Amino acid sequence: MKHVFILNPAAGKGDDIAPLTLKLESECKRLGVDYFIYLTQSPGDATEFIQRECAEGGKFHGETCRFYACGGDGTISEVLDGAARVEGAEVGVIPIGTGNDFCRVAVRRANFILTSRLR
């Protein structure tokens, strides 16, 4: 399975996402998982990225992918929209937005351990 992290650098307070990127890379390498990190450029980019790269000729065509929305509610919405059109796609969330309303309502677990989700 390919683990695709879609990070929105504008999410939250616009803090530097380099530490998160480095942590994701470090954990994926340590666990030996196949991963890809993508930084969104503009609104709607996450949906377009997923659709483009999962289509024939795209880098993920024919692969089973888990897409991680790393951002706020808007990023989650875009990733869900893109992944809903990809057969067999899975979605995970790493909330780094300001409100994170989706996670407050939909996620009951307070402790999220990324490494347990990467296996």
Show which residues each predicted segment covers.
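ATP/NTP phosphate-donor binding region
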Residues: 1-67, 117
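Gly/Ser/Thr-rich beta-alpha loop segments that engage phosphate groups in nucleotides
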Residues: 14, 73-76, 97-101
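A glycine-rich beta-strand to alpha-helix segment
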Residues: 64-70, 74-78
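Glycine-rich beta-strand-to-loop/alpha-helix junction loops that act as flexible
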Residues: 9, 70-72, 94-96
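Short Gly/Thr/Asp-enriched flexible loops that form oxyanion-binding sites at enzyme active sites
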Residues: 75-87
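Phosphate- and divalent-cation-binding pockets in alpha/beta enzyme and binding domains
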Residues: 45-48, 78-79, 101-102
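Catalytic core of DAGKc-family lipid kinases
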Residues: 4, 30, 65, 84-119
